[in-house]
Amino acid sequence: MLPWKKHKFELLAEAPPRQASKPKGYAVSLHYSALSSLARACPEGALSRVGSMFRSKRKKLHITSEDPTYTVLYLGNATTIQARGDGCTDLAVGKIWSKSEAGRQGTKMKLTVSAQGIRMVHAEERALRRPGHLYLLHRVTYCVADARLPKVFAWVYRHELKHKAVMLRCHAVLVSKPEKAQAMALLLYQTSANALAEFKRLKRRDDARHQQQELVGAHTIPLVPLRKLLLHGPCCYKPPVERSRSAPKLGSITEDLLGEQQEEELQEEEEEHLEDCLEEEEEEDGVGDGDPAEEEAEAQRALVVAMQLECEDLLDPLENGHEEALGDGGVSLGPSSGTSLPLSVCASDMKAQLSQLISDLGDLSFGNDVSTLETDLRVTRLLSGESTGSESSIEGGGLDATPVSPGNPSGPADSTSLDEPYSG
């Protein structure tokens, strides 16, 4: 239709309405009426709800920080006979201190405290090719920041030799400040406690799973997902037995046919000899039979006497142990005593003491006061990674008045040939 002029205005034909273009891809188109209805229904939280529709979910992940590393001067080690207890390292630390000429001789090392244990590597660049040393956490029985020598940190390690032999050695290192030695001792104690608790938790979970498999069946209980194993990783507190030096080495079994035949012949001869002996005893019993009632009475009397003797043997150690435990209070458990405790009470007390002793075997004994060190600001700053003066808390600078002797570059490899080699 052609346009025409009227009263100086141009009137044009209306163009056909354009069709709305379809959304491309996965774009979401929201209508204005839907938004307006949502705003009218929820006037307060409309904007926040609309924004939450397009907001991505955020998660916070805690990245494991690196294990703290300290620059120390390794003084050496000495044998000891006490695995734990107050003052168990005094004599050994004294020997090490005198042997190192009051801390003037030693090897500069990098000491790292981790969930596996204490790892030491050489700090000098020329000695980096030498193998390091790893002291496994479950074999460390005692650690202390020495009170007589405040800058000395010592620990007792249970070395395992061949044929399941055990040797206790006390190791000592010298640091630059007393609070640094205290921080190292507290860190080792806390790491050991946490690792032991995690080891017990995983052990209880595995035991419960094995019990369920025995009751219900091995195929009905699902295995632990591989994702969970990779996420948590293996427990580092106690490595598998295969890594132990005292573990038996398994080899191939060679079958000997001649030896098997000889063993079978010997076994047959022993069985024949045993049958002949039994036949002879039966013949002798048949010849000398007496009154069966008298024999039965004698057997009953012998059984009663044997039971009395066994009961006395069992009661004697229980009574003696409880008398020693209650000796200070003046309570006697003998036959002439007027005061007596039931046997069940004694047995329960001994069982509780035994369970407590077993539970304490894996705990690391600490030679310092935990509460005092945890409230010390200098120690907590060192553990948190803050600097306390001219030297960094994690990567120490030099050692005050403790020069490294050039005549002893070997370090703990010469004196501690029993250490576990550090791999990696």
Curated annotation (Swiss-Prot):
Residues 382-394 have a biased composition (Low complexity). Residues 261-299, 382-424 are annotated as: Disordered. SMART domains: PTB. InterPro entries: Adapter_Engulfment-Domain, FAM43A/B_PTB, PH-like_dom_sf, PTB/PI_dom. Residues 405-418 have a biased composition (Polar residues). Residues 261-297 have a biased composition (Acidic residues). It comes from the Eukaryota. Belongs to the FAM43 family. This is Protein FAM43A. It comes from Mus musculus (Mouse).
